Amino acid sequence: MKVQLNSLEKDYHLSIAYPVKADLAESWDLIASNAGFTKWFPQLRIEEDKLIFEMEDFREEMELLVYQENQVIAYDWDGAKVSFHFENRDQCSYIRFEELIPKDFGNEFSNAAKDMTGWLVQNECLTAILNQQKLPDIDQAREKWQAFVAEQIK
């Protein structure tokens, strides 16, 4: 995975790019469909033009900004903007994740550093799934990416 985290004036820009063995349709289905969400982010689902995040006593509806099948999905993420871009390259699929997140992002569950760490862990898991590899140890992945984010934003 190629990872870049840049500090802008008011935001952080996180970019993660990686090739996967899975074809474009399989990659899209995992990352941008309700059936796929159940495999890597079961709290998410798409309803019409909304992305729904739901767990126990919490429900958040976020605007689906772009949905171009097999190309790009982008959505509001509680004030941040998240997108996945899909391409065919050299006999594999290529995925680019981007998040533009306000430096002052935060709610009762998260802040900018935790959110970016979470997306780094999720993308590491997506890479493993789409390459038919064993999932990483989540705690180890979280520790690794927490340290990376902390170093980048200090």
State the predicted function of each range:
Residues 15, 52, 107:
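Conserved short-loop catalytic and cofactor-binding motifs
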Residues 19, 25, 35-81:
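Glycine-rich portal/gate segments that line the openings of hydrophobic small-molecule binding cavities
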Residues 76-128, 139:
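Beta-strand/loop substructures that line and gate deep hydrophobic ligand-binding cavities in soluble
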Residues 128-154:
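Short, highly charged C-terminal tails/helix-capping segments
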